[in-house]
């Protein structure tokens, strides 16, 4: 029986496609706005929501999503309204989320069998419910970017100009922060907390080798991201290693190879 005939692998392929689409949109905004550190903070802060979910006996992905959105809003509010340095606000929510997650993990009776999959990702843990959640998040992200593309483009490259044009910058920033948090949490089953940030940045870096157009980077990063995921899933299956690490390893190797090829071609022109 071929591996692609197994339901868990089909879920992984579908999930990786949906994750690539969502991360293609959101990751391009993150890289353009230089919000990589914020996305890393939200990713690790979401561990607090996972711990709370496990401790209370509720769906840890849903509790992590709520916690991640709250953390994203907290960072945005502290850096804009309270005038706390953005990196300090990120560090605050990052470390607090991790501490809450660790405390809840130790206070939960018994053993947390899903903990490694949340940290490192696993194709075996992607369920139909995870696919539905990913599909919903992807649909919301794609809809928002389609409806507000010009506003998002203006905010991404020139926040001051966007405000001068009376665009709803603050509202859009909070909305995009929520979408960043939702996208991150919805991909945790695939790549895990430790490596989720790379799925939002490496495909965009690879696409940026060939184009500087915001729209084209989105399209290219979706295709590159899915190729990275498929290569990583194959490595994960053949070597029996965590899918998250395999996907990110494959994505960085592909990026390095393409960058080397581009440099070599340019050198010998």
Outline where the language-model segments fall.
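Membrane-interfacial amphipathic/re-entrant helices at transmembrane-helix boundaries
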Residues: 1-21, 269
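Transmembrane helix-bundle core of multi-pass membrane transporters
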Residues: 6-11, 82, 90-150
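Hydrophobic alpha-helical transmembrane segments
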Residues: 13-18, 61-66, 91-92, 131-136, ...
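Alpha-helical transmembrane segments in multi-pass membrane proteins
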Residues: 15-24, 45, 49, 53, ...
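Helix-loop-helix "hairpin" substructures at the membrane interface of multi-pass membrane proteins
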Residues: 19, 130-203
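Short loop segments and helix-boundary regions at transmembrane helix junctions
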Residues: 28-111, 207-219, 236-239, 263-264
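Transmembrane alpha-helical segments in multi-pass inner-membrane proteins
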Residues: 190, 194-245
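Cytosolic-side transmembrane-helix boundaries in multi-pass membrane proteins
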Residues: 241-248, 252-269
